[in-house]
Amino acid sequence: MDTVVDASVIIAVIANEPTKNQLIKLTQKADLIAPASIHWEIGNAFSAMLKQNRITLYQARQALNAYSQIPLRFVNVELEESLKIAAELNIYAYDAYLICCALQYNSPLISLDKALQRIAQAQNIQVIEVNT
């Protein structure tokens, strides 16, 4: 079954955050999909960590190597539909891409972002619960 995954989940797994094992277990049998924009979100997250001196460039490269090992299929989402969703829900485009992806592929969403979870549920998207 396809499952839409967001950057918060990917970062939690590759950064060995406390939810890592649970996230892996919850997605073990899923085919992970994400809009292509997630690639740039991951890069942005690591550049922010570098800027804040939370990680070194070496650690960022190791994390990117771990990221490349995650079986993730990048999918296209309709830009116009995503912008419509962003406008209607008053959300950022990156979140709208995820909502659009889940709707377009009729797939559940897994995220650690509580606001995104609420928005998805309001759109009748199944949200995979993560205990944080």
Positions of PLM-derived features:
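Active-site-proximal, substrate-binding regions of enzyme catalytic domains
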Residues: 43-73, 77-79
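A cross-family signal for key residues in well-ordered alpha-helices
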Residues: 11-12, 24, 44, 83, ...
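Acidic, PIN/NYN-like endoribonuclease modules and their adjacent C-terminal/linker elements
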Residues: 2, 35, 99-132
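Short, well-structured N-terminal submotif of metal-dependent ribonuclease cores
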Residues: 1-37, 49-61, 123
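Active-site neighborhoods of divalent-metal-dependent phosphate/nucleic-acid chemistry enzymes
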Residues: 70-108, 112-115
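A general structural signal for well-ordered alpha-helical segments in protein cores
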Residues: 7, 20, 39, 43, ...
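Conserved beta-strand segments of alpha/beta enzyme cores
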Residues: 31, 73, 126-128
